[in-house]
Amino acid sequence: MLDREGFRPNVGIILINAQNEVWWGKRVREHSWQFPQGGIKFGETPEQAMFRELEEEVGLRAEHVKIIGRTRDWLRYEVPDHFIKREIRGHYKGQKQIWFLLRMVGRDCDVNLRLTEHPEFDAWRWHDYWVPLDVVIEFKRDVYQRALQELSRFLSRPAHPAPIHNTARYLRQTHSARKTDEPSTEQTKPNNE
């Protein structure tokens, strides 16, 4: 289902935990990371599509999350021609998305990436709200930045852009999900420095 301009209605999901860390999923057999997203089916509201995609891609149900906010308007990105199937070139331009900010109220063990026959992700992790977006496929980076920026106003404490260190490299490394009782591996400076 495309609009008159050739954009497919879609939802995007920014899932945060109690520390305002963001859930990132690694695409199956790829080295790129992204947020859960998916198309809105005929007759679905954006909220219904969001809950369906959240369960299909992450394994979480409505009782595992709380809706914190959503974007005011559609955010669009165009898909380069070489990513578009030949038979729909000329008609399909890209995606227009309503983005939702969700707080996870469930536990990390509630995440199930293998709920469907064709999973989207093969790994996941929590990371700072502001992270360099070079691990995201290039044509989606701008819409990610706009969604993160617009939805940051709903965070319970300010999430300011963090200094860019090696966070992009961190997303590329293989890690298992961090347990909430494990100490952070980040080093902190003493207050007198």
Swiss-Prot record:
Protein's organism: Herminiimonas arsenicoxydans
Positions of short motif Nudix box: 38-59
One Pfam family per UniProt: NUDIX
Protein name: RNA pyrophosphohydrolase
Gene that this polypeptide is encoded by: rppH
Keyword Acetylation: no
The protein's required cofactors: a divalent metal cation
MF-aspect GO terms: pyrophosphatase activity
The organism's taxonomic lineage, starting at the top: Bacteria, Pseudomonadati, Pseudomonadota, Betaproteobacteria, Burkholderiales
Annotated InterPro entries: Nudix_hydrolase, NUDIX_hydrolase-like_dom_sf, NUDIX_hydrolase_CS, NUDIX_hydrolase_dom, RppH
Broad class of enzyme this protein falls into: hydrolase
Disordered: annotated span: 174-193
Disulfide cross-links: none
HAMAP family: Nudix_RppH
KW Kinase (keyword) present: no
UniProt KW keywords: Hydrolase
Superkingdom, natural source: Bacteria
Family: Belongs to the Nudix hydrolase family. RppH subfamily.
Family annotation (PROSITE patterns): NUDIX, NUDIX_BOX
EC number: 3.6.1.-
